[in-house]
Design a protein with these regions (language model features):
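Glycine- and acidic/polar-rich repeat regions and solenoidal domains
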Residues: 1-196
Length: 196
């Protein structure tokens, strides 16, 4: 599933399982950033809510992290290119490559989710003001990942010789003043566990 500029959208009490098991290419000239191999990806959106859902890939072989980006699906839920004030709360993720991916966004709340047996649990990459709290992550190779990449201020690519020049501007994020920097992160009261 994908959503672009679908402001004030709520996905609630759904079950996502084994989507795109054939690994069809989904990112082309017509279907852009919001089309990718994941259970759901949203872009350029304000006030998106993903609540009370189940993302279940338990029929797949266990995700060990060695197959981090090549297994079926790169993420359970993926907020990218300017999700503003998204809420990803009270969901259950089973055997996902990455359960929750918060990328170049602002003000995302990731709370009260259960993540079981995944390659990565929660990944926050170059997003500002994210709040990660009250999540339970078990038997997951990379429970919480924080990343800062080279992109800033809505610019996907800068000129190699003059970094002041943006060669690939993402207009939505730039117009909203998003920094695309990992700043203002609050992370507390999460439980990370494993079994022997």
């Amino acid at each position: 599933a994908g959503a672009n500029r679908a402001h004030n959208t709520t996905f609630e009490n759904n079950i996502f399982t084994e989507n795109n098991a054939a690994n069809y290419l989904t990112n082309g000239s017509v279907c852009l950033a919001w089309c990718t191999v994941s259970e759901i990806k949203v872009t350029h959106i304000e006030n998106f809510t993903f609540r009370g859902n189940v993302v279940d890939n338990s029929k797949n072989p266990a995700s060990t992290g060695n197959d981090y980006y090549v297994r079926n699906g790169t993420a359970g839920v993926w907020c990218d290119e300017g999700c503003i004030k998204a809420k990803i709360v009270n969901n259950f993720f089973i055997n996902t490559t990455t359960a929750i991916f918060d990328e170049v966004s602002d003000g995302t709340i990731i709370a009260s989710n259960i993540i079981e047996g995944s390659g990565a649990g929660i990944s926050v990459s170059s997003s500002s003001n994210s709040k990660v709290y009250n999540n339970t992550i078990s038997r997951t190779n990379r429970p919480i990942m924080l990343n800062e990449d080279a992109r800033t201020n809505g610019c996907n690519e800068r000129d190699a010789h003059n970094p002041q020049i943006c060669k690939s501007l993402e207009p939505w994020s730039a117009s909203k003043g998003l920094s695309w920097n990992l700043t203002g992160l609050e992370m507390y009261n999460n439980i990370i566990s494993s079994r022997a």
